[in-house]
Amino acid sequence: MKPHFRNTVEPMDPRTFVSNFNNRPILSGLNTVWLCCEVKTKDPSGPPLDAKIFQGKVYSKAKYHPEMRFLRWFHKWRQLHHDQEYKVTWYVSWSPCTRCANSVATFLAKDPKVTLTIFVARLYYFWKPDYQQALRILCQKRGGPHATMKIMNYNEFQDCWNKFVDGRGKPFKPRNNLPKHYTLLQATLGELLRHLMDPGTFTSNFNNKPWVSGQHETYLCYKVERLHNDTWVPLNQHRGFLRNQAPNIHGFPKGRHAELCFLDLIPFWKLDGQQYRVTCFTSWSPCFSCAQEMAKFISNNEHVSLCIFAARIYDDQGRYQEGLRALHRDGAKIAMMNYSEFEYCWDTFVDRQGRPFQPWDGLDEHSQALSGRLRAILQNQEN
């Protein structure tokens, strides 16, 4: 039997949406969780079969949370539509709590014909280890069915507004900080789920051939260490990668460089007054403006040391040399990536699936030449 679409959604009030789907990372007083869901067949051209809105209170019993309400509703719905594979999409104001995440993971394991994509406006108790583990199990890619979880960007907020809000023809108006908050939450989710980079993305963007062209993206991998008894101890909860935000993508009209996205993220970690070492591995060295902002950061945070390893030197025919010298003068360690740094990034940040790092032709020669060029740039500050 071919199911038919049933429009059972009572649209959400615009003020309710704007208030509850605020993507400010840290919010208090919003105790209601909203879940907007859409069910389709896996045929991408097919129309929605059903749509619902669920709500619940974060501090109520788990059975009253919207995720559990969805599971009960979908169990009944599935009995009438058991002969096909379905794609379920959620837009939620808070990501699932531990118990709900575990229940959803169990549901997906029992019904492999259902795929679930979860777009979240905010992360709920993301700093708690049990919560982190529950989300990793829910989104685990290997070993069985899993959910795909993403942070809502401008497009998802707009889609949710168009599908579930009584906007009366008015377009979605994003908050001013939506892009910045998106970047923070996306990086945090990447840390939490331990996202890894596609091998092709790494080899394409971190190739240190001097004649590379057409690479307009900057990737930045990072790790954080804390000094304890004269030993640098890795803080694996603050390890990941991000890239620049291109213009007009995710609500950034002018775009935002990867280094600035990274600087936005650091205060979110709430590092205390102990000594920390932050190491960045970048596909391009910082431009003048980013170098200035990074220099300002280390000047204002003397307990944090910064090391930057770049695959290539970004030469915009502008003041990039001046920026690198200022960054170096203010205490940052700047060097070109060599074989050991490329291998470390491959082993740490790439979904290599057991494959060892394979250097490209000329890697060592290019690294030596770039190191000499960088050395000349930095030494010029003393001339």
UniProtKB/Swiss-Prot annotation:
Region spans: Essential for cytoplasmic localization: 1-68
Annotated positions of the Phosphothreonine modification: T32, T218
Interaction with DNA (site feature) positions: N244
Cellular compartment(s): Cytoplasm; Nucleus; Cytoplasm, P-body
UniProt PTM comment: (Microbial infection) Following infection by simian immunodeficiency virus (SIV), ubiquitinated by a cullin-5-RING E3 ubiquitin-protein ligase complex (ECS complex) hijacked by theSIV Vif protein, leading to its degradation.
Cofactor: Zn(2+)
Top EC class for this record: hydrolase
Effect of K270R: In 2KR mutant; decreased ubiquitination by SIV Vif protein
Binding site for Zn(2+) 2: H257, C287, C290
GO cellular component, one term: cytoplasm
Region (Interaction with DNA), start-end ranges: 213-215, 312-319
One record GO biological process: DNA cytosine deamination
GO molecular function, one term: cytidine deaminase activity
Residues bound to Zn(2+) 1: H65, C97, C100
Highest rank taxon of the organism: Eukaryota
Note: Accumulation of APOBEC3G induced non-lethal hypermutation could contribute to the genetic variation of primate lentiviral populations.
Subunit record text: Homodimer. Homooligomer. Can bind RNA to form ribonucleoprotein complexes of high-molecular-mass (HMM) or low-molecular-mass (LMM). HMM is inactive and heterogeneous in protein composition because of binding nonselectively to cellular RNAs, which in turn are associated with variety of cellular proteins. The LMM form which is enzymatically active has few or no RNAs associated. Its ability to form homooligomer is distinct from its ability to assemble into HMM. Interacts with APOBEC3B, APOBEC3F, MOV10, AGO2, EIF4E, EIF4ENIF1, DCP2 and DDX6 in an RNA-dependent manner.
Function: DNA deaminase (cytidine deaminase) which acts as an inhibitor of retrovirus replication and retrotransposon mobility via deaminase-dependent and -independent mechanisms. Exhibits antiviral activity against vif-deficient: HIV-1 and simian immunodeficiency viruses (SIVs). After the penetration of retroviral nucleocapsids into target cells of infection and the initiation of reverse transcription, it can induce the conversion of cytosine to uracil in the minus-sense single-strand viral DNA, leading to G-to-A hypermutations in the subsequent plus-strand viral DNA.
Protein name in the entry: DNA dC->dU-editing enzyme APOBEC-3G
Organism listed in the record: Macaca mulatta (Rhesus macaque)
